Amino acid sequence: IRKMHKRVLYENYLNFNTENNSVNLIFPIDLFFSDSELSTIKEIKNSLNKFGFKYVLKEKMLSVLAIPSNCDESKIREYFEDFIQSKINNTSLETDFKIEIAKKLCKRNAYKPKRKLSSSEIEALYVSFHKCKNQKFCPSGARIWESLTTELISKIIKP
């Protein structure tokens, strides 16, 4: 279920329309970062704005004003730490970085393994999943599901 949810979130993030999917915070969240981290955040501002993150850079501080609608407000610092790390690690092309942001967000926001889902949540996930372009792999490359062939069944049941 988690891998399916990651795939759904990932494809939603890649097709994100910030005008409709950004939620303004009632109270801005202030996060303190080092000068080098703030410099990196400044570099990626346009990319993050496209995902629905709205923020103002101040001296030694980042003031977050809006976040994507399906992001958890309590994880904002973790999101920005992930984005900084991704930017530092390698991604220089805009499209590659957009993919990295989408992967980080879906990983943080996917259903947790021990969470019990209601039947309506499972049904909604199933419908959303079948609208995805890629239904075999989650964004990390792990297989979501596998079709059972007679060959595979015989390997599993082999005495």
Regions found by a protein language model. Give the residues of each.
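Long, charged low-complexity intrinsically disordered regions
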Residues: 1-159
